[in-house]
Amino acid sequence: MNRKHDGASISFQPRIRRGAFFEACWDHGCRNFSVYNRTYISSTFSNPVDEYWHVINHVSLWPVMGERQIEISGDDAERFVQYITCRDISNCSVNQCKYALLLNNEGGIICDPILLRLEENKFWISTSDCDLELWIKGVQINSGFNVQIKDANVSLLQ
């Protein structure tokens, strides 16, 4: 069933984060937002047809505020990151990114993030709309790996 919800609005709640570019998007006319990874993200600034032609004929800058960076650091960071992904990261140099798969015990895909090696023992995992930080902390809790896991609290642009 297709229903129109003309006039629908969204209430901004404190439990949903406003990314670093939220106010700038608002100031530039965005009045349509959606929630992605517990973050308000800008949806449209005018109308979809005008925005399509703008992307085709001009330049667009997209705040991907909902893509969170999970930081894994510590003496065992490389071994732990290798433990949670099936991608061989032994040849991942500092300042290099790799596409990685994180799988559950049955081989199902949990998430397919981009992995960035910032330092020898510091990685960022760029997560999409999933609770990956909680899953990673759950894997680490009794693993014996000496790592720290946290939200890097940065905002990205594409």
Indicate residue ranges for each PLM-predicted region.
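Acidic, low-complexity central loop/insert segments
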Residues: 111-158
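Acidic, proline/glycine-enriched N-terminal capping motif
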Residues: 1-103, 108
